[in-house]
Amino acid sequence: MLLAFQAGEGQRRIGAEAEWFRGLLAFPYTNRLDELPLAPPYARARYPFSFTYNGRPSDTLLPVWPTASGSNDLGGGVATSWRAWTDPATGLRVRFESRCHQGFPDRDWVLYFENTGSRDTPVIENIQALDLTLATPLEGDASYRLHRTKGAPADPTDFEPAIVPLKAGQTERLSAGGGRSSNRDFPFFKVETGEGSLIIAVGWSGQWAAALNSPDRHHLRVTAGQEQTHFILHPGERVRSPRILLFLHRGDTWEANARFRQLIYRYYAAKRNGRTPLPILFCNTCFTRGGGWLNECNASNQISLIQAYAPLGLEALITDAGWFEGGWPAGAGNWTPRHDAYPLGMAPVAAAAAAHAMIYGLWFEPERVVAGTEFHRLHPDWVLTDGRPGQTTLLANFGLREVQEHFFTIVKGFMALPGFRFYRQDFNMDPLDYWRHNDAPDRQGITEMRYIEGLYAYWDRLAATWPDGLREECASGGRRIDLETLQRMPLHQKSDYWFDNEVDQASLWSLSQYLPNSLVTAPLTRLDDYSFRSTLAASLIPAWIADAPGFDLERARKLLDRYRAVRHLLVGAWYPLLPYSRSARDWMAVQFHRPDLGEGMILLFRHAESPYRTVEVALRGLKAERNYALSFDNSGETQRVRGADLMSHFLLSLDARPGSELITYREIAERHHQ
C-alpha cells in the first residue's frame, strides 16, 4: 500500500534529502548561512527550536549546558533519537525527542521541559517548537512560496487552499482558532524552496501558531509552537511542546504531497487491530434526516435502520447526539440514556447491530458541560469557566486525572455491551478563553498544556483498551484535525457543512493534499452518480432513509459495491488534475494512484454552468512505456492507452451539466514472446 520508489534516481533523492535532515539535527547547526553573501545575523539559527529562559535566548544557553544523547531503532521502520540539555544552576532539563521513518525524507520531534531541581524555575517563555531559517530561495520575484489551507468554519470555504508568494519583508501567520487546531487554519502547510518542497505539520490539538517571515530575498524564518507560553515549573514538573513534522521532497511539488500522504498512512494514521484501515463504510443516523435527527431517535427507529442497512454490508451504525437525559444540546453532562427513548438502555440497539454483523456506537461530548447537568452537580471542582458571570457552558478539565478516569469509566460501561465498539467524540465550544482564564500570570500556557496532555492520555487509553474499536473525532465538524488527532482517531468528520456536492468536491480536494482519504468522513444522502462521486473520496457515510417504503435498495447496493471496489485507491498517491474550484463554471478533476498495484482512478466533474464540454488533463505517476486499460463507468467503455499519452494529453468529455465520470485504470502486463 506504500508508494514504492525506483532504485537509482529515487534512492539518490532520498539520500540527498536525508543528508539535509542530518545537517538540521547536527546541533548546533547553521544551515549553511555563512556560505551566502550578506547573511544577516538575525537569520542565523543554531537549533531547529527556540525558547527564552530567565530572559536569555536558548541559542546562547544550550551550547554551554551539559548534554546527553542517545538513539534507538524501534523496528517497523521507525528510528528515534534524543538529546537533553540541563541547566546546572536551576535544574531545568530540555529534552528533544525525534524520530524518522524508513524510506521517507522526514523528521518529527517534541520538546520536553522538566524541572529536576528543588525550587521553582525562572520563567520559560516564547517556546517555538520549530524555529528554522531556510537559505535556499526560489528564483524570480518570490523567493519562497507558501501553500496554506484554511480551517473548517462550517461554510463553503472549509479547507480552501491558497498559494502565497513570500516576498522580502513579508510575514504570513497561521494559527488555530479559539483553541481548536483546525478551526482557523489547517495545521499542514508547504513551502516551496530552492532546495525542494518542505511540508510542515503541527501536532497540537489546542492553540498553535506559526509565522513565516522573509526578511530579505535569501532567507525565510519559519516558527511554530503553542501560541502563548510564559511560565515557571515547580519541582518535578514536566510539560511538552507541540509535535513538529518536517518532510522535504526534491522534485515536483505535487509529488511531495503524494509521498507525504504515504508517510501519514503508514506511520501516523491511527490503527485498528494493529493495521491502518482502508476507508470505512458506516451510517451516522442523524444524517438520514438532514443532520438534525437527534432527540427524535429512539431504540425502535435505530433498530429499524440497522435492519434496513444490513443487506448493504455496512461496518457500523451509530446514534448521534440526543440519546442522553436532557437531550441535545442541553443534556451534555448527563451520560445516561433517556428512559423515554431507550427504556432498556442501549443494549438492545447494540445487540441488533451485532446480529447483523455490524458494530454500534454513540456520540459523546465529554469536554463540554452544561451547567446543572449531572457532571456539574456532582463534580463542580472538575470544570473550568472563562470568568464570565452566569456561565452556562463549562469545560471539563481534562488536565485532571479524575476527569479522564470518570469518562473512561462511562465509555467502558457502554463498550461492555455486546456489539458496542464505536466511539464518536464531538466538541462544540472554543476552550481557549477557559484555559487562559485559569492561568496564573507566571503560569501562562500551563492549563492548556495539561488539558491537551490529559486528552491524549484519555484517547490513548481508549485505543489501547479496545484495539478493535472505531473512533471518530468531530469538533463542530472538522475543527480539530491535526497530526496528534490523526494518530489517535481513525476517522475525522471533515465539516459541519453538508450535502453540497461542489463543496464536498472542493474540501476533499484540499484535504487530499496531505491526508489519505480514509481519515475523513463525508455523508451521502442521495442516490445519483454525481452526488456519490462528490463524496466518494472519504470514509463514506451512507445517510439514506433505508427503511422508508420504496427505498431503492438495489441502487444503493450498486453504489456501495462500486465504492468497495475502488476505496483501496484512496490511500495511495493523490494528484490534482485541475485546480481547486467551487465555481459553477469550472471543472474539477483528481487522480488517485497506487504505484504498488499499477492501478488508479480519476474523478471528473463538470459543474452546472460550465460552457465547456471537453477538458484536457495530464495524469501523473504512470510508466510512460507501458499500456494501461481504462474503464469508463458512465458508458462501460474500455480503452487501451500508453502511459506517455495519458501523461501528456488526455481529452475527456461530459455532456451533462452538472456531470461526472469515474474512470479506473490498470497497467497491462506485457507478454514476452520467445
Regions found by a protein language model. Name each.
Residues L2-N213, E227, N627-R640:
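Polysaccharide-binding surfaces and accessory modules of carbohydrate-active proteins
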Residues T288-R377, E405-H406, R450-Y458:
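Aromatic- and glycine-enriched glycan-recognition loops and surfaces
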Residues A16, L455-T638, S653-D655, S660-I663:
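Active-site-proximal substrate-binding groove within the catalytic cores of carbohydrate-active enzymes
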Residues L278-F282, G290-N298, H339, E365-G413, ...:
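Active-site-adjacent "subsite" loops/lids of carbohydrate-active enzymes
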Residues V641-Q674:
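C-terminal beta-strand-rich structural cap/linker in extracellular carbohydrate-active enzymes
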Residues F231-R250, P658-R666:
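Short Pro-Gly-centered flexible turn/kink motifs
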Residues L281-N284, L317-T319, Y360-F364, Y423-Q425, ...:
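Hydrophobic faces of well-ordered beta-strands that scaffold small-molecule active sites
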Residues P329-D340, R368-R388, N438, D442, ...:
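Aromatic- and acidic-residue-enriched segments that line the glycan-binding/catalytic groove
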